[in-house]
Amino acid sequence: MSATRSTFLGSIFRTAKARILISPIARRSLPSPNFTSSRFHTSSSLRQSRIEGSIPRSFLPSIHVRFHSVSASTWFSSRRTSSQGRLASVSMYIQYSTSVPTRSLRRRISNRKKSSAKPILNVSKFHETISKLPPRFTPEELADAITLEEDPFLCFHLFNWASQQPRFTHENCSYHIAIRKLGAAKMYQEMDDIVNQVLSVRHIGNENLYNSIIFYFTKAGKLIRAVNIFRHMVTSKNLECRPTIRTYHILFKALLGRGNNSYINHVYMETVRSLFRQMVDSGIEPDVFALNCLVKGYVLSLHVNDALRIFHQMSVVYDCEPNSFTYDYLIHGLCAQGRTINARELLSEMKGKGFVPNGKSYNSLVNAFALSGEIDDAVKCLWEMIENGRVVDFISYRTLVDESCRKGKYDEATRLLEMLREKQLVDRDSYDKLVNVLHKDL
């Protein structure tokens, strides 16, 4: 009976001693050591006791972190054996993990600290900039002062100071240069404050100003905010604020730059298609960049037939001739689906117009020809790619060597590796990897 009582009192003593080391904020959030919240499990023999909110003595010197609320994510547990042989289990939620954080986690923490760190205003430089302005300065003179200033945070305070001056009103030039300064410095919260001021004034705004706002919102990843600015332009009664072809270019580029996931591109492609239809219905003639955005979007979302339809309509319907980017997008999409016949036809048409495929198109052709068993065409395309100064990636070399061995052309694969080594087209590490591929297939 005395041993049981001493074990129970020792557990409570350890709990009280551990709570001394916990901050008052965390102490209020932790459960109190009673029978309901701390969940003491007492059996007839009291062989095991589980205490929430306590720390074993062996861990007390090594833990120097501040404990926070129960919303902390890591479960810290430890077991220790008492001198009498009894087992005590101790567990607690803490905010930090004992494992080393990954590189991506460290990068996110660093970026979060940089974004949350508030810049400090240089007061002397601020007063010096104000002193250079004339007594009755105009918005153009303020815009020139903001342009010459390198500190974007000082520009933001200078803009706000000018807003408080009597008989001064901002115009498009001062709004525009301030937004460009803050957007280029990635001070999006301060930029958003100025954008709200622009939207609150009806007679302020033009196409260049709103295009810059949309551009920097897309750079910040705020697509919804950018689309709302676009809708404001469409419904604006000021004709100078209506969207132009450049506005649609910014939105197309932002929507199609969301990654290489075909499902994500399929979702965003619906928005691109509706924007393109709205652009045509509003009387804006699409140019080759807008049409290439459609072709690229269809290729990224694996709708190559729709991309070919736009390609055939470019000169007939929209009076735009396809350029090298159009052919590069289509060749890559056709090769990704293994349609080497159509890709070869487009390649011949592209060369007939004097265009040279880029490295991505050549690599796609080499891989597609090799995977379809056309080894000779793949090797020919490879040497043509090297002659045109395009960079061959390691995947193309490996695919060509691997598929040559599958077809039983070991001599051709060996000869290709020797030529690559003699012309120093691959480094030593890549050459050894290709030799291992050849020996593995042998």
Curated annotation (Swiss-Prot):
Protein name: Pentatricopeptide repeat-containing protein At2g27800, mitochondrial
Targeting signal (transit peptide) range: 1-67
Chief place of localization: mitochondrion
Transmembrane segments: none
Family membership: Belongs to the PPR family. P subfamily.
PPR repeats, residue ranges: 206-236, 244-286, 287-322, 323-357, 358-392, 393-427
Top-level taxon in the UniProt lineage: Eukaryota
GO terms for cellular component: mitochondrion
Keywords: Mitochondrion, Repeat, Transit peptide
Localization of this protein: Mitochondrion
